[in-house]
Amino acid sequence: VWDHETVSTADTPGPRLVVGLANPGPDYEGTRHNIGWDVLLELASRALPMPASFSTHKRTNCEVAQTRVADQAVILARPRSYMNLSGGPVAAVAKYFSVAPTDVIVVHDEIDIDFGQVRLKRGGGEGGHNGLRSVTAALGTRDYIRVRAGVGRPPGRMAVADYVLKRFSKLEQPDVPFLVQDAADAVELLLTHGLETAQNQVHSA
């Protein structure tokens, strides 16, 4: 049972919210489009003294886990809807935990960044990403923070939709865990030191 009081009180700052965009169900596990969920699982696995576990939060239609980073309460959330309908659950979980739209951190796949690279930014366009379009529409702003996990562009004439819904290639597979770890590291830097410092460290790596 989720209760606001277990996460924050009047004497402490409210929780931070990290959202991982993904499609639900086993058919989509391991696909490029689901890298945001993989990053959330990595962050949950780092929780001490034991990994954080996800449970269904029916009121917001999200899978939710609670952890701490640098002594801050952090909510990890994955919408249970399909990617192009992510916005409703993201807005609902932000409202439930009293997180301002501009403080929401969204982790997602990014075709305009080379595979294996991670980039951070606040605001900007959605680059054709239907999950981001939905989130922007529901939050009413583009000025949320994005952790962009590079999956590269599709080869040849392959459609973007087909590419992101496929699993990583055999050549890429060995490096996927490093991409996930790097993106999780970037989230922790964001939470600990803020966007500008995190950008400086991540983008110079």
Model-based region annotation:
Residues W2-G123, L132-V147, P154-A159, K166, ...:
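Nucleotide and nucleotide-moiety/phosphate-recognizing core
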